Amino acid sequence: MNKNEYMMHLLARTIRTRNDDMITPLITQLADMQVSMDILEKHNFPALVAEYAPFNKAAQSLSHSVLVWKNDELAQEKSYMLKEFVRICKDQHQPEEFLLRLTCSLINLNDFELTRSCFDIIVSFGLTLNAYDEFGIFRKAMEYQGQMEEADKIISDVDAMLLRNEFLEEDEAEEQADNEMDAFEEEGVEEVDQEVVDFNDNESVISETESGVFTDEELDMEDHAEVMRRHAQDQALVSEICMVFLAGCIKSGRSDVISAAIQFTGAFFYPLALLRKYDIQYLIYCYGSHNEDAELLMNHIKHLQAIEIAGERQEFFKMFMETTFRNAETVTDSVMAQMKGFLEDGDDFMISCTLHVFLKMPITLSQFKNSHVEACLENLESGLAAQLGFMLKMKIQLLEQIDYEIW
């Protein structure tokens, strides 16, 4: 662990103390430090600040800087991402139900470029009038009439279908008069259809090739690997679009929309890096903390993050203990706050080491009381940590007795 990584761990833990007197000076101290986005992303600082230091100006400034940085990167990726999404959808001869619903839902996020791309896709899908009505596509296209060619094309297509339906209704009477002739012709068609079915059964390889599906026998291993690679890339890009949709729905603040988006996108199955990239945890704090599904997703993200940095937390703890207590004769209040954090979220090793320090060092009663260490001791149920915790309780009680006798 290098110095930058160590200091970012220290900053993250300091923000969790909720202590403005510790948070502000440390952020000021680190203001000129050059830190990579990967390290900042790892600690999810916007979400940390939203939860633990929402009113601290220095922390708010840090969060804002990180969000601006990330949004700039997302903006640079957006054009390529939308172009590829359009390609993926248009490559399908028949749109998948999921992609159809995703595309039709994205137009409601009020993002001009995103809506333009989705209208372009929708035109290629060749939807029915019922679909245009069910997904509210025509109504949305009317909002952009004259502003984008894709919206005008949808309006034109719908008008043409409506006109065609009028002609069909006028011809309905004539069609009814020819029912007997139609029934006779259908008998002949059934025989022809059966022959076509038999032909398709015998020429299944041709039908598969025409639909864009190739068997392993038709492809050599390199071609097959390339197809699989492209498929994986396409799936990854669709996942990015899903995160755009989920983020937009959370920003709406509407509980029903948030729950529906979490369920529709399968948000719990996406990798941590993608959830962090689109600041899903941060957005939940800002717009969706009132929603049970969003809260479950937020806790899920926290769990994934704890697993990811578990090894680094161990390394940070060892470095912190070594640098803090190498020649220390006393324990400062800020160190007490950090140590209490190890009691709250540390593993057995961290907790035991922390309790050893509390037993060994000359810590005052007021320091124990102000840091609320005793509350953490109640959660120690068994093992070495529980034994050390009992000993620390005895130490605190002894300090209380001495303090009482003095007064």
From Swiss-Prot:
Keywords from the named record: Cytoplasm, Nucleus
UniProt tissue specificity: In the embryo, expressed in newly arisen somatic blastomeres.
Superkingdom per UniProt: Eukaryota
InterPro entries noted in UniProt: Pes-10
CC terms in the record's Gene Ontology section: cytoplasm; nucleus
Keyword Nucleus in annotation: yes
Cellular compartments annotated: Nucleus; Cytoplasm
Family label: Belongs to the Pes-10 family.
UniProt-recorded name of the protein: Patterned expression site protein 10
